[in-house]
Amino acid sequence: MRGWSAVMVVAALMPVCVWAQVDSTPQTMTDSSKILPDGTAYVTRVVPVPKTVSPEAQAMLARVVSDAAGPKHSIEQERAGIDRWQTGAGEVSKQLYPVNVAAATIAGVPVRVVTPLTIVPEKQNRVLINVHGGGFHVDSGSLTESIPIANLTGTKVISVLYRMAPEHPFPAAVDDTIAVYKEMLKTYPPKNVGIYGTSAGAFLTGEVTAKIKQLGLPMPGATGIFSGAGDFSVAGDSIAMYALDGLSGHLDVPKQYGGDLGDYAGSTNPKDPILSPLQGDLTGFPPTLFITSTRDLLLSGTTIMHRAYLRAGVDAQLVVFEALPHAFWNNPKLPESKEADALMAKFFDTHLGK
């Protein structure tokens, strides 16, 4: 049941890791395909590195990925390794986007408080809540997802260090985020609060929004769902299309998710309307920005969710980046990452307080 964890963890790490190098001798490749009577397609496709992305992104996509799975690690070892990476990546982000970072506890929940060096008076009365990625098992984004946005928006970001699977399955992470949101409502008008997340945090952002509605709480001013999905019962076509589950942008043997989500979902029905918001009523949800990319395993999940929001009458925007993999903005040095972060910041600047 740990497969989805590994997928989502590598998702956050792939864009910033140094790829293992293997034999890169040029080989002749051709397209071929076979389609069965039931519509199942077996496709071998030549996918060159596109010229439509930045030179930095081209270099990332051109690197060869090792087939070696590597040794298995315990959840404790996995978390320790990811924590070390997140600390280092956070320092890189702070060099590009200077902020102050402090540990705190809000409503009994540990958080990181990421504060701009200067907050202008008109932005003092607003706050953003980040729900980090990491496959519901590790923290692969509380710094890298929060630092750029705090700097660019000039707004304090509270990154929720929610309880994680497998020790704490659904709805623990939702409950922790709701507790922080309720506490924010004691200080900030709901229209001045935004919630956003990447990957697992994007799933959670939708779930938290559904829970806010179920509880009858006032909706936040805006949400951001970045490389996410809203239905645990349906994987979507891009899961089967992209290799390494669309984490690196390379193609490989397709993987499916299903039982791999079990550590987080636990005994909850995959069609539960909080676990899978698309199974419920989305009317009244706040303005939402969706961001994905064409080699993201959750391209389908993100676009399906965007259309569901539109059908429900929600003010929903979708941005799809060319050729890049899942959660590529975790590499803060890519020009496309800077563009994505700027889009996120502009969206919250536009909608908070309205």
Regions found by a protein language model. Give the residues of each.
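Positively charged n-region of N-terminal signal peptides that target proteins for export
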Residues: 1-4
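A domain-start/cap signature at the N-terminus of enzymes
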Residues: 76, 80-104
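Alpha/beta-hydrolase superfamily serine-hydrolase fold, recognizing
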Residues: 21-40, 44-60, 64-71, 96-354
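Bacterial N-terminal signal peptides
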Residues: 7-16
